[in-house]
């Protein structure tokens, strides 16, 4: 569960290392974001020479959360960290590589480019 002021690790090669959620998209009173949800975030830590700079406001999709999520078959999935992938306005990733596993919920939300770049889909 990601909410305003949550910090997430960036799981791609855009140059950002950490982002801070400033808004959960999907309704005026929406409070939490889970795997596959889009957030607006600001870059808090970045490497020099990357595509994004510290202070940039970006859109990102959540790919891993520490809070467990119940699947329709009754199983639960949770990860060791909160992570997101920075996306363009057309929902394609800005980076060319994805690091670490991503949740299967991204396939249901039609983030196929992220699914194809990810090394593992859980």
Curated annotation (Swiss-Prot):
Keywords, ordered alphabetically:
Ribonucleoprotein, Ribosomal protein, RNA-binding, rRNA-binding
Sample GO molecular function, one term: large ribosomal subunit rRNA binding
Domain of life the protein comes from: Bacteria
Presence of the UniProt keyword RNA-binding in the record: yes
Taken from the UniProt entry, a GO cellular component term is: cytosolic large ribosomal subunit
Q: Biological process GO annotation list?
A: translation
Please give the function described in this protein's UniProt entry.
Binds to 23S rRNA. Forms part of two intersubunit bridges in the 70S ribosome.
Give the family from UniProt.
Belongs to the universal ribosomal protein uL14 family.
User: How does this protein assemble?
Assistant: Part of the 50S ribosomal subunit. Forms a cluster with proteins L3 and L19. In the 70S ribosome, L14 and L19 interact and together make contacts with the 16S rRNA in bridges B5 and B8.
Protein known as: Large ribosomal subunit protein uL14
């Amino acid at each position: 569960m990601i909410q305003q002021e949550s910090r997430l690790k960036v799981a791609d090669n855009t140059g950002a290392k950490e982002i801070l959620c400033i808004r959960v998209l999907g309704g005026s009173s929406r409070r939490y974001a889970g795997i596959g949800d889009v957030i607006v975030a600001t870059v808090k830590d970045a490497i020099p020479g990357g595509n994004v700079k510290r202070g940039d406001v970006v859109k990102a999709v959540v790919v891993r959360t520490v809070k467990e999520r119940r699947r329709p078959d009754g199983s639960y999935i949770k990860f060791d960290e909160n992570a997101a992938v920075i996306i363009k306005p057309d929902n394609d990733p800005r980076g060319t590589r994805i690091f670490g596993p991503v949740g299967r919920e991204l396939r249901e939300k039609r983030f196929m480019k992220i699914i194809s770049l990810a090394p593992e889909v859980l």
